[in-house]
Amino acid sequence: MASGILVNVKEEVTCPICLELLTEPLSLPCGHSFCQACITANHKESMLYKEEERSCPVCRISYQPENIQPNRHVANIVEKLREVKLSPEEGQKVDHCARHGEKLLLFCQEDSKVICWLCERSQEHRGHHTFLMEEVAQEYHVKLQTALEMLRQKQQEAEKLEADTREEKASWKIQIDYDKTNVSADFEQLREILDWEESNELQNLEKEEEDILKSLTKSETEMVQQTQYMRELISDLEHRLQGSMMELLQGVDGIIKRIENMTLKKPKTFHKNQRRVFRAPDLKGMLDMFRELTDVRRYWVDVTLAPNNISHAVIAEDKRQVSYQNPQIMYQAPGSLFGSLTNFNYYTGVRGSQSITSGKLTNFNYCTGVLGSQSITSGKHYWEVDVSKKSAWILGVCAGFQPDATYNIEQNENYQPKYGYWVIGLQEGDKYSVFQDGSSHTPFAPFIVPLSVIICPDRVGVFVDYEACTVSFFNITNHGFLIYKFSQCSFSKPVFPYLNPRKCTVPMTLCSPSS
């Protein structure tokens, strides 16, 4: 029993690297102890392989060299153990063959087993390659050391694979969480769009119901009156036929002619096959439009209007609103500011002026177009204009003019890109158009192209990409539907936001980014 205890103690104070009793033992923070020479050699190997962290050869827990401590207690145990000599019986159990009792001196290569000389001659090991343990111990020590290094390298690869897998797992989680957020946002937008479309469609159906039922109710009343008239006429005829001869003949020709000339009034009908057919909205297209609008809104700038004493337009104190003011010019005597007015014109272009020096004012133009204070010379810019309840307006961008400059009317009245205007407009309440360059036959008149706008916008978004040379207009009321886009604009000069309320007293309002 004492020998068993000694063997166990010996195992506890044996170096895991060299498998010998510890020499100058050093302990790591994890609790494992090694010979000073062995752990030092391990450090050098770590530096050779450029490992960032040093780890325990047994449990692979990282440690810092300064945390290694000499273990004097273990050193004392090793010294005492070296002084203890096992009894012959105990030594026999450790170093002698359990079968033959002979000392174990040989190594069988085929069976990878330590044997005695009698085992070598037995049938079990006959013909095997056997060597003295001293002859092969160093060779196998080198092989085991090589295997250990290979295993450590594979362990490093395994740890890297583990770290890569953990990193990929985290990356996937982040990506999927991001996709979840986007999906939720997209479906929330779709729900909003669907709610709006449903409400709009129901409103259309309610209006259709109101109009049709109102008309049919009117027709029903007329049919009731017509039927009642027929009843009264039939009753009159029956009375004549049943009465005296005098009653029969009294005014008979007039009654007969009235009956012969009578035509039944037919009710107004509505054909169901001619009704507007409901079609489900293109959700993907609408969502793409909404995403494009969300993207350009990232470049929203706070635009204000430049003061304008020339243009016949009223700018609010907050410089966000412009409205048309109906001109009221009173006649004054010659020599005063205003004399008689002839050939009076209302012009709704960019600001212009004409000096008034005599008592007669001819061909006077009132202008209602105004510019934004901020010039655009690079980058991307976006703003929105509230045009609700207006029956006419023009908006977009204007290039080449300073907000406080006085221009020539004849030069600036043409809304053409070649003159520095990239604008769209509304007139007569429902006619939308874009102003393009005139033809070679009419170079001084813009070519006005009608625009198909299904839902009239209460708010219009304007997006300028200076580097891409584009100006885009969005129908905010219709989920950001693209109204029109100018491409290949020649922005050779700074451009300014342009608003023109035209001859409509309802104001145009620049919306703040927070609205």
From Swiss-Prot:
ZnF B box-type span: 92-133
Keyword field: Acetylation, Antiviral defense, Autophagy, Coiled coil, Cytoplasm, Immunity, Innate immunity, Metal-binding, Nucleus, Phosphoprotein, Transferase, Ubl conjugation, Ubl conjugation pathway, Zinc, Zinc-finger
Modified how: Degraded in a proteasome-independent fashion in the absence of viral infection but in a proteasome-dependent fashion following exposure to restriction sensitive virus. Autoubiquitinated in a RING finger- and UBE2D2-dependent manner. Monoubiquitinated by TRIM21. Deubiquitinated by Yersinia YopJ. Ubiquitination may not lead to proteasomal degradation.
Residue span(s) of domain B30.2/SPRY: 283-515
Nucleus recorded as keyword: yes
Pfam families: SPRY, zf-B_box, zf-RING_UBOX
Coiled-coil residue windows: 137-225
Domain notes: The B box-type zinc finger domain and the coiled-coil domain contribute to the higher and low order multimerization respectively which is essential for restriction activity. The coiled coil domain is important for higher order multimerization by promoting the initial dimerization.
Alphabetical list of CDD domains matching this protein: Bbox2_TRIM5-like (cd19761), RING-HC_TRIM5-like_C-IV (cd16591), SPRY_PRY_TRIM5 (cd15822)
InterPro entries per UniProt: B30.2/SPRY, B30.2/SPRY_sf, Butyrophylin_SPRY, ConA-like_dom_sf, SPRY_dom, TRIM/RBCC, Znf-RING_euk, Znf_B-box
Function in brief: Capsid-specific restriction factor that prevents infection from non-host-adapted retroviruses. Blocks viral replication early in the life cycle, after viral entry but before reverse transcription. In addition to acting as a capsid-specific restriction factor, also acts as a pattern recognition receptor that activates innate immune signaling in response to the retroviral capsid lattice.
GO BP annotations, alphabetical order: activation of innate immune response; autophagy; defense response to virus; innate immune response; positive regulation of canonical NF-kappaB signal transduction; positive regulation of MAPK cascade; positive regulation of NF-kappaB transcription factor activity; protein K63-linked ubiquitination
Matches recorded under PANTHER family: E3 UBIQUITIN-PROTEIN LIGASE TRIM
Annotated residues for binding of Zn(2+): C97, H100, C119, H125
Family to which this protein belongs: Belongs to the TRIM/RBCC family.
The protein's name: Tripartite motif-containing protein 5
Modified residues (Phosphoserine): S87
Keyword Secreted set for record: no
Organism field: Chlorocebus tantalus (Tantalus monkey)
Region Required for interaction with GABARAP and for autophagy: start-end pairs: 187-200
Zinc finger (RING-type): 15-60
GO annotation, cellular component aspect: nucleus; P-body
